[in-house]
Amino acid sequence: MEINGVEIEDTYAEAFPIKIARVLITAVTKRWAQVAATEATGFGTSVIMCPAEAGIERFASPSETPDGRPGAYIQICTFKYEALEEQLLERIGQCVLTAPTTAVFNGLPDSEKQFNVGFKLKFFGDGMESEAQIAGRKVFKVPIMEGDFVTEDNIGAIAGIAGGNFFIFGDSQMSALTAAEAAVDAIAELEGTITPFPGGIVASGSKSGANKYKFLKATANEKFCPSIKDKVENTEIPADVNAVYEIVINGLDEASIKAAMKAGIEAAVTVPGIKKISAGNYGGKLGKYQFKLHELF
């Protein structure tokens, strides 16, 4: 299969189950919503070494938020609900409560699983906190130096999916990077997914385990490293490819990840110099979800 003259390899992305909390952060301006969302999702690229995977899903206009202010939806992802609640408390408490003019609302109010994160955060008020209603939602007002920090009582979570992905092969580092940026920008317009790596892009895609250093649980995926393609048996790098980037996608459900992969690939192949689109899988050893590239189109 080819799209815009770019080969779409007949392969699939392998993904795995993960627990996802969705939080809406609002602020007086989009800038401050983005600042708080960025801080709250820091150190959240991969559960290989990070305590959670996290990212900004999309921005919200004032017309769609409970308090009528600009906002940002974020997702925080862990393997277990217990760890997820801990991450919510730490990230909201340290990165959103401390940010100017922010408020926190439940991004999954209808989900079965709910954490009383707001109830716990209210104790920062040391007895001076109060209960209120905003757009029919139970919130707590916590007095702080600038006024009140508002947080909804509960934050919802669901069983989601992590590790949807595709690889972008370019004839140069800049062509591959430009295509990866275009892919991330396209995905950012959609609802339900995040791209948790720096700027949404993975420069150092890994394989599970190691060939030599057995004490590591993840190491460089040498078959996708252009600088050593002449040294690696069964390299996946064609002769005319000099850079590869991976886009990793977490999402609330399969449909959201499929839509994000499709939009990202369609954006990437419009960039001159892109030679091929592929995906990463581990023969079923990593996860139960398979997103076949050809079936996206």
UniProtKB/Swiss-Prot annotation:
Compartment(s) where it occurs, according to its Swiss-Prot or TrEMBL record: Cytoplasm
GO cellular component terms, semicolon-separated: cytoplasm
Keywords noted in UniProt: Acyltransferase, Cytoplasm, Methanogenesis, One-carbon metabolism, Transferase
Primary enzyme class: transferase
GO BP terms: methanogenesis, from carbon dioxide; one-carbon metabolic process
InterPro entries assigned: ForMFR_H4MPT_ForTrfase, ForMFR_H4MPT_ForTrfase_C, ForMFR_H4MPT_ForTrfase_fd-like, ForMFR_H4MPT_ForTrfase_N
GO molecular function: formylmethanofuran-tetrahydromethanopterin N-formyltransferase activity
E.C. designation(s): 2.3.1.101
Reaction catalysed by this enzyme: N-formylmethanofuran + 5,6,7,8-tetrahydromethanopterin + H(+) = N(5)-formyl-5,6,7,8-tetrahydromethanopterin + methanofuran
UniProt pathway annotation: One-carbon metabolism; methanogenesis from CO(2); 5,10-methenyl-5,6,7,8-tetrahydromethanopterin from CO(2): step 2/3
HAMAP family membership: FTR
Functional note: Catalyzes the reversible transfer of a formyl group from formylmethanofuran (formyl-MFR) to tetrahydromethanopterin (H(4)MPT) to produce 5-formyl tetrahydromethanopterin (5-formyl-H(4)MPT) and methanofuran (MFR).
Assembly and binders: Homotetramer.
Protein family (similarity comment): Belongs to the FTR family.
Protein name: Formylmethanofuran--tetrahydromethanopterin formyltransferase
Name of the coding gene: ftr
